[in-house]
């Protein structure tokens, strides 16, 4: 299920565009997640009160958290599948503290793909989308394996 060198290059090329405006991308990804899957908001005490897209766009905390999420993901993607050291603490916190189900990671992966396609259609065609989808699936599968080691049935 690994990615070829060419696929990793496509992932990292588009990720460079994300990093140019990581706060904006992170905010859009979380808004897409929360509006598409409102149940995910229940895992975020500081965002539960945000009911509309306008409220979400106005939230500096949401923008900051989007930056944290995409910064962590970028660090993992840059490891090109060799992300054990980065993944372990992330899986630990998401399994034991936050109790984030794997399904929610699928939801945010879909949100990432959607946001990248809408913001960068010229740089995120079918091949790049396929590569990013594979990279995010690899990440989720590895998180799921760590969850299992930790006894979390997320």
Swiss-Prot record:
PROSITE patterns associated with the record: GLOBIN
Disulfide pattern: none
Locations listed in the record: Cytoplasm, Sarcoplasm
GO terms (BP aspect): oxygen transport; removal of superoxide radicals
Keywords, sorted A to Z: Cytoplasm, Heme, Iron, Metal-binding, Muscle protein, Oxidoreductase, Oxygen transport, Phosphoprotein, Transport
Binding site for heme b: 94
PTM sites of type Phosphoserine: 4
Protein name: Myoglobin
Gene: MB
Subunit structure: Monomeric.
Amino-acid positions noted as binding nitrite in the UniProt annotation, renumbered to this chain: 65
Family the entry assigns: Belongs to the globin family.
Summary of the function given for this chain in its UniProt record: Monomeric heme protein which primary function is to store oxygen and facilitate its diffusion within muscle tissues. Reversibly binds oxygen through a pentacoordinated heme iron and enables its timely and efficient release as needed during periods of heightened demand. Depending on the oxidative conditions of tissues and cells, and in addition to its ability to bind oxygen, it also has a nitrite reductase activity whereby it regulates the production of bioactive nitric oxide.
Domain Globin: 2-148
Positions with a binding annotation for O2: 65
Domain of life: Eukaryota
The EC number(s) this enzyme carries: 1.7.-.-, 1.11.1.-
Reaction(s) catalysed (UniProt annotation): Fe(III)-heme b-[protein] + nitric oxide + H2O = Fe(II)-heme b-[protein] + nitrite + 2 H(+); H2O2 + AH2 = A + 2 H2O
GO terms for cellular component: sarcoplasm
